[in-house]
From Swiss-Prot:
Keywords: Coiled coil, Cytoplasm, Nucleus, Repressor, Transcription, Transcription regulation. Homooligomer and heterooligomer. Core component of the 7SK RNP complex. The gene is hexim1. GO terms for cellular component: cytoplasm; nucleoplasm. Residues 1-56, 132-196 are annotated as: Disordered. Residues 168-180 have a biased composition (Acidic residues). Signal peptide: none annotated. This is Protein HEXIM1. It comes from Xenopus laevis. Residues 213-284 form a coiled coil. Belongs to the HEXIM family. Pfam families: HEXIM.
């Protein structure tokens, strides 16, 4: 068999026609053949081919690569984190913080209710426990129970016949209730309530002092000193007034005693005149 020859220009992708000047034909691109296994050689060949075909793309790629390298060297600036909302459990809040929180919640609820009413949406009643506090604080409890009846008057009442006839078991129960439903007498119950009030007040005062800062404690101490000095001045002023009014009080007491003596004399004179009038009436026919 005869061997078939292949034209080198056709094998390289060329054309059999000669290129014309000023036409749309260009010189064939010379391509270099590289082994398949060498990846670096293949990439270099592609770079050369792309540079030969479009040199502007290579320049642009190199400039972009330089920009990325420069950007990678720069330090990444992080945005400053916003102040996080400091949350504290409700049981650890102070009295002032609890009051501010409740005021904010009530204002927010009122604002939302106003917006919903303006939009014509139905609004549920505002959930609050203020009515419970109002019912609780309507009047302060009476910490002074009524005085207990004296034990000396009880035997006299028992000896009275009218008391024996009218007394019933209900009256005795009422007397026991007046003496104290908890088994304590009037004075004992009053002492207990006074002691309990003092302990509660001292505990609350100690807790309030613990919650105060150093500056607040100093301020409170200075205020107490001012109050103490003012009370001492007032006490001294009252003492001077009492000493000044003592002679007038003594004079008033002596005048009262003199009037009492004159009253006794007038009573005796009246009795004497009554007796004389009776005798004159008896002697007359």
């Amino acid at each position: 068999m005869s061997e078939v020859g292949i034209c080198k220009s056709l094998a390289g992708g060329g054309s059999l026609l000669a290129p014309k000047e000023g036409g749309g034909w260009h010189h064939p691109v010379e391509r270099e053949e590289h082994p398949v296994g060498d990846a670096n050689t293949v990439s270099e060949g592609h770079d050369k081919e792309s540079a030969y075909q479009n040199p502007g793309q290579l320049v642009k790629a190199e400039a972009q690569e330089d920009d990325w390298k420069e950007l990678g060297k720069k330090r990444h600036r992080r945005l400053r984190s916003k102040n996080k909302r400091r949350w504290k459990p409700y049981d650890k809040l102070t009295w002032e913080e609890k009051k501010e929180l409740e005021e904010r919640q009530s204002q927010r609820a009122s604002r939302i209710r106003a917006e919903m009413i303006a939009k014509g949406q139905p609004v549920a009643p505002y959930n609050t426990t203020q009515f419970l506090m109002e019912d609780h604080d309507q009047e302060e409890p009476d910490l002074c129970p009524p005085p207990r009846k004296s034990s000396a008057a009880l035997p006299l009442a028992l000896n009275n016949s009218s008391y024996k006839g009218d007394s019933t078991d209900d009256d005795l129960e009422e007397e026991e209730d007046e003496a104290g439903s908890d088994g304590m007498g009037g004075y004992d119950g009053e002492d207990f309530l006074q002691k309990d009030f003092s302990e509660t007040y001292e505990r609350y005062h100690a807790e309030s002092l613990q919650d105060m800062s150093k500056q607040d404690l100093i301020k409170e101490y200075l205020e107490l000193e001012k109050c103490l000095s003012r009370m001492e001045e007032e006490n001294n002023h009252l003492r001077v007034q009492s000493l000044a009014s003592a002679p007038a009080a003594d004079h008033r007491d002596t005048r009262i005693q003199e009037l009492q003596v004159e009253l006794e004399k007038l009573k005796e004179e009246n009795q004497r005149l009554l007796q004389e009038g009776k005798q004159v009436a008896a002697d007359s026919p």
